[in-house]
């Protein structure tokens, strides 16, 4: 990686906050902002996070959906396992014909 990029990343306030708060990426703060402003994810919701790696937004969605909610983190890149019990990881290309069946299987056939 470019040394300049690494240096800028270390100085980035959201990168530091993500590290301090245990989020996997600074992108978590984008969803946190949207969630605070619009409340798009409610307790018990099912969330499909496309292009989820490394998983910062999935973490936020997990907390917003709560224990009765469920998050599927989908990416063709590897995603480290989550400690949150309501997140399932699918390593798959979103364009794969298998994705619809895999998602339906994880949600018990409910959309």
Label the model's feature ranges.
Residues 74-111:
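S-adenosyl-L-methionine
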Residues 1-42:
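Class I SAM-dependent methyltransferase Rossmann-like catalytic core
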Residues 43-53:
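Conserved class I S-adenosyl-L-methionine
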Residues 32-36, 58, 101:
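A generic local structural motif
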Residues 68-72:
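Short beta-strand element of Class I
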Residues 54-66:
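Conserved SAM-binding loop of SAM-dependent methyltransferases across substrates and taxa
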Residues 40, 50, 89-91:
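Charge-rich alpha-helical segments
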